[in-house]
C-alpha cells in the first residue's frame, strides 16, 4: 500500500482531475492509449508538464521548423540546453534566451532572479563559462503603481542574482505600453565561451550507468510551474505563488563551478539542468535523446523536508539543480567533487535497456511510462488563423510642434535613458566588458585573446502587431544592425516568442506570419536560429499583450584593437546613412499623437541591410568611424539627442527632412560619426553636421531651428524614469 495519499486512477478519470493539471480530454485519452491503461496520479502529473505548451511547443512547433538552424559556424543547434557557434581557434560561443513572464507577474523579484539563474544553468550545462547576461523587459505604463512595483522587483531580481553569481549584465532593453499591464515580459539571455572538445549534451546512455542528482534539496516550490507558464493570467493566478520558484545565487555559484569542473571528467556521459518541469523533463529528455530507459529511485532524492511525494518530487522546480549520467563505478569521484563544493548530491538511479521511464519509492512503482512517447509524442495543434484588418487611412502629421514632440518622446519611458535601472547591475565583474549598457550592443572580450563577443537583445511589438510578417523581418534586422554598429560580424541568433493565446484566430495568425518574416530575415542575413523559447498565453483578464518576438544575436570581433579609438570627439563629422521616408505606422510618434498603432508601414529591404552593413562594419574596423548608432524608436532627432547627451558633446546639424520626418522610424538607417579628417564614402551616406565642444544641441531643417543645452537634454532623458518612479509612489 502506498505511503502517500493520492486520488485513485478511477477518481482521476471520473472527476476529470487531469484537467486541473492541464490535460484536455483528448490528451488524457492519448495517455491511456500510450500506457494501455489508466494513468495514476504521478503519471498524469508527468504527462501534464511534459505536454504543456512550455515544454512541448504543441501550438508553435510547426512554425519553429521553418527557421534555418544550420550554417557555416553552427556546431550545435536547437535540441540541447543552448546553441553552440564556432568563433575560431577551437573556441565557441554558447547562448540562449528564455522567458520567465508568468512567475515575474506574481513574484517579480524571484520570478526575474530565477529566470536569470535558469538561463545561466542552461549555458553551464553545455560546459561553457558564462561571460555576460542580457535581458529584454516589457511592462505596462509607469503611471500605474502596480507596474512600478513590477519594474522595481524585476530589476532588483536580475541584479540580485547576476551580481551575486559574478556574471556581468551588459545589455538589454526595457519598453512600456498598457498592453503589458499585469503581464510583464521578462526574457533573460546568457552568453558563454567553451572549447570545442568540452561541449556536453543532455543524454542518458550506457546500460548500468548511474544517474546523479546535485544541487539544492528538492522542496515543494515551483510544482506545476511549467503548466502555470502555459496558462492565461487571471485573478486566481495570485493563488499560484507556490508555482514561483525561489533562487539562491550563492548555491548557484557553487553549482556552476562544480559543474564546470565535472565536465573535465572523462567519465561524464551527459548532463542537463533541471529547469521547467524539474526532474521530470531533465531525466525523461535525457533518456529519449540517449535512446535508453531510466530507473529512478525517488527515495534517494535529497529532499528539504519529509513526506514529499513522488508526484511532488517529479514536478518540483526547486532551483539550482543538475542531473548527470556518469559511468558505472565512478560515482564516488563525482560525489567527492560535489562534496568539496558543499553541494548536496546522491546517486538516484541508473540507465536501463527497457526504453521505459520507471520511478520507484521504497521499491513501490509510482510510474512506468514508455520514454519516446512521453518526450516526443505530445500532440501538435494546427489551428485556424484570421488576418487582421488594417487601417489604410493616413494620419495627419503636417502641423507637428517639433520642440514639444521632441521633449515628450525623449522623456517617454520607452525612449528615456535606463541608466538609473542598469546601474543596479554589475556591468564590469570579470573585467572583460569593453562596451557597457547604453546606446549600443555590448562587447565582452574573450579572455586571453584579442577576440570579443558582441551581443544584443531586441524585441519588437507594435510593428509586429501592425504587420506581423514585416514586423518579424524587422526584429531580426534590428538586432543585426546593432551588431554591425560595433563592428561585429553577426553569427547566429536565439529567439523568444512572446504571444497571447494561440486559440484566438488573430493571435494564431500573428504567430504564423511573424515567424515567417523572421525566418526570411534569418536566411538573407545569414543568422541561423540555434536555440530559443516560446511563451504563449500572455494575457490578463482576456486582454493579450502585443505579439512580441525577442531576438538575441551574437557577433564576432576578431581583433578588438579598433575599439580603443571607438569614441566620438568634438570635431568629428556626423553622417546619416539611409533614406528617411514618411514611416509613422507603429511609431512612437503615432502612439503619442493618436494613441493607436494600427497603420501600415514600409517593408524592409533585407538585401540592402546586408550590403549597407558590410560597408559600415568595414568603416568601423578601418578606424574611420568613432561611433555608430542605429536610428530607432523616436526617429532621427531623438537618436541624435541621445548621442549628444550620452557623450556630453554639443552637436550642430542641418537635416534635409520635413518636421514629421524628424520622428519617422524608417528602418535600415544609421548615424555614423566619422573621425575628424576622415570621409565616409558609402552610398546613401549624407554628411549632416558635426560634434562640438560647445554644450549646445543645435539642429535645424528648412522649417525649424532648435537650440537646446546638452545638459538640459541629458537631464530630461536620464531623469524621466527616476521621476516616474518617485513622483508616482
UniProtKB/Swiss-Prot annotation:
Mg(2+) 2 binds at residues 122, 273. GO terms for biological process: 'de novo' IMP biosynthetic process. ATP binds at residues 57, 96, 495, 532. It catalyses: N(2)-formyl-N(1)-(5-phospho-beta-D-ribosyl)glycinamide + L-glutamine + ATP + H2O = 2-formamido-N(1)-(5-O-phospho-beta-D-ribosyl)acetamidine + L-glutamate + ADP + phosphate + H(+). It is an enzyme of class 6 (ligase). CDD domains: PurL_repeat1, PurL_repeat2. It comes from the Bacteria. It is found in: Cytoplasm. Its EC number is 6.3.5.3. GO terms for cellular component: cytoplasm. Its main location: cytoplasm. Monomer. Part of the FGAM synthase complex composed of 1 PurL, 1 PurQ and 2 PurS subunits. PANTHER family: PHOSPHORIBOSYLFORMYLGLYCINAMIDINE SYNTHASE SUBUNIT PURL. This is Phosphoribosylformylglycinamidine synthase subunit PurL. The gene is purL.
Amino acid at each position: 500500500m502506498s505511503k502517500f495519499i493520492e486520488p485513485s486512477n478511477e477518481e482521476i478519470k471520473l472527476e476529470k482531475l487531469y484537467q486541473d493539471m492541464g490535460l484536455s480530454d483528448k490528451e488524457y485519452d492519448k495517455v491511456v492509449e500510450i500506457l494501455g491503461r489508466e494513468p495514476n496520479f504521478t503519471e498524469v502529473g508527468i504527462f501534464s508538464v511534459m505536454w504543456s505548451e512550455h515544454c512541448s511547443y504543441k501550438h508553435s512547433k510547426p512554425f519553429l521548423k521553418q527557421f534555418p538552424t544550420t550554417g557555416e559556424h553552427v556546431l550545435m543547434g536547437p535540441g540541447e540546453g543552448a546553441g553552440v557557434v564556432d568563433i575560431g581557434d577551437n573556441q565557441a560561443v554558447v547562448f540562449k534566451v528564455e522567458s520567465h513572464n508568468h512567475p515575474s507577474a506574481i513574484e517579480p523579484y524571484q520570478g526575474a532572479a530565477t529566470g536569470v539563474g535558469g538561463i545561466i544553468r542552461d549555458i553551464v550545462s553545455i560546459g561553457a563559462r558564462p561571460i555576460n547576461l542580457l535581458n529584454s523587459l516589457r511592462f505596462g505604463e509607469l503611471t500605474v503603481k502596480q507596474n512600478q512595483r513590477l519594474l522595481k522587483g524585476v530589476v532588483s531580481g536580475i541584479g540580485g542574482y547576476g551580481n551575486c553569481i559574478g556574471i556581468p549584465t551588459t545589455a538589454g532593453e526595457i519598453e512600456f505600453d498598457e498592453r503589458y499591464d499585469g503581464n510583464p515580459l521578462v526574457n533573460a539571455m546568457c552568453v558563454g565561451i567553451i572549447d570545442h572538445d568540452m561541449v556536453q549534451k543532455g543524454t542518458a546512455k550506457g546500460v548500468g550507468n548511474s544517474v546523479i542528482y546535485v544541487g539544492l534539496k528538492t522542496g515543494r516550490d515551483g510544482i506545476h510551474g511549467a503548466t502555470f507558464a502555459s496558462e492565461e493570467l487571471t485573478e486566481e493566478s495570485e493563488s499560484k505563488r507556490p508555482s514561483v520558484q525561489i533562487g539562491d545565487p550563492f548555491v548557484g555559484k557553487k553549482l556552476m563551478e562544480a559543474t564546470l569542473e565535472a565536465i573535465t571528467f572523462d567519465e561524464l556521459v551527459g548532463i542537463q539542468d533541471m529547469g521547467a518541469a524539474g526532474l521530470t523533463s531533465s531525466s525523461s529528455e535525457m533518456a529519449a535523446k540517449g535512446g535508453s530507459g531510466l530507473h529512478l529511485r525517488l527515495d534517494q532524492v535529497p529532499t528539504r523536508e519529509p513526506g514529499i511525494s513522488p508526484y511532488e518530487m517529479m514536478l518540483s522546480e526547486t532551483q539550482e539543480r543538475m542531473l548527470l549520467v556518469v559511468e558505472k563505478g565512478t560515482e564516488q569521484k563525482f560525489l567527492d567533487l560535489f562534496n568539496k563544493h558543499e553541494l548536496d548530491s546522491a546517486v538516484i538511479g541508473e540507465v536501463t535497456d527497457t526504453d521505459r521511464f520507471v520511478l520507484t519509492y521504497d521499491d513501490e512503482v509510482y510510474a512506468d511510462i514508455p520514454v519516446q512517447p512521453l518526450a516526443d509524442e505530445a500532440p501538435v495543434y494546427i489551428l485556424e488563423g484570421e488576418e487582421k484588418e488594417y487601417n489604410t487611412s493616413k494620419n495627419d502629421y503636417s502641423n507637428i510642434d517639433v520642440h514639444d514632440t521632441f521633449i515628450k518622446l525623449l522623456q517617454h519611458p520607452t525612449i528615456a535613458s535606463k541608466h538609473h535601472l542598469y546601474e543596479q547591475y554589475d556591468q564590469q565583474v570579470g573585467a572583460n566588458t569593453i562596451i557597457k549598457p547604453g546606446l549600443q550592443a555590448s562587447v565582452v572580450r574573450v579572455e586571453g585573446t584579442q577576440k570579443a563577443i558582441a551581443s544584443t537583445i531586441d524585441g519588437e511589438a507594435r510593428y509586429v502587431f501592425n504587420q506581423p510578417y514585416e514586423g518579424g523581418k524587422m526584429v531580426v534586422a534590428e538586432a543585426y544592425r546593432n551588431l554591425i554598429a560595433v563592428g561585429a560580424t553577426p553569427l547566429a541568433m536565439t529567439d523568444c516568442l512572446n504571444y497571447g493565446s494561440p486559440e484566438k484566430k488573430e493571435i494564431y495568425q500573428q504567430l504564423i506570419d511573424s515567424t515567417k518574416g523572421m525566418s526570411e530575415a534569418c536566411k538573407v542575413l545569414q543568422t541561423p536560429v540555434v536555440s530559443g523559447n516560446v511563451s504563449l498565453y500572455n494575457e490578463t483578464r482576456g486582454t493579450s499583450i502585443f505579439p512580441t518576438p525577442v531576438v538575441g544575436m551574437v557577433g564576432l570581433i576578431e581583433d578588438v584593437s579598433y575599439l580603443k579609438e571607438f569614441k566620438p570627439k568634438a570635431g568629428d563629422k556626423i553622417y546619416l546613412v539611409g533614406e528617411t521616408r514618411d514611416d509613422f505606422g507603429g511609431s512612437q510618434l503615432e502612439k503619442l499623437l493618436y494613441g493607436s498603432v494600427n497603420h501600415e508601414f514600409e517593408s524592409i529591404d533585407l538585401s540592402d541591410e546586408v550590403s549597407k552593413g558590410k560597408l559600415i562594419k568595414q568603416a568601423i574596423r578601418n578606424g574611420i568611424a568613432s561611433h555608430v548608432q542605429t536610428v530607432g524608436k523616436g526617429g532621427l532627432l531623438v537618436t541624435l539627442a541621445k548621442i549628444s547627451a550620452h557623450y556630453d558633446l554639443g552637436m550642430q546639424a542641418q537635416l534635409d527632412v520635413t518636421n514629421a520626418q524628424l520622428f519617422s522610424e524608417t528602418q535600415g538607417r544609421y548615424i555614423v560619426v566619422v573621425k575628424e579628417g576622415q570621409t565616409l564614402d558609402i552610398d546613401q551616406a549624407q554628411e549632416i553636421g558635426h560634434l562640438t565642444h560647445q554644450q549646445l544641441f543645435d539642429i535645424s531643417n528648412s522649417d525649424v531651428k532648435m537650440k537646446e543645452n546638452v545638459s538640459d537634454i541629458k537631464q530630461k532623458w536620464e531623469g524621466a524614469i527616476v521621476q516616474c518612479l518617485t513622483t508616482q509612489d
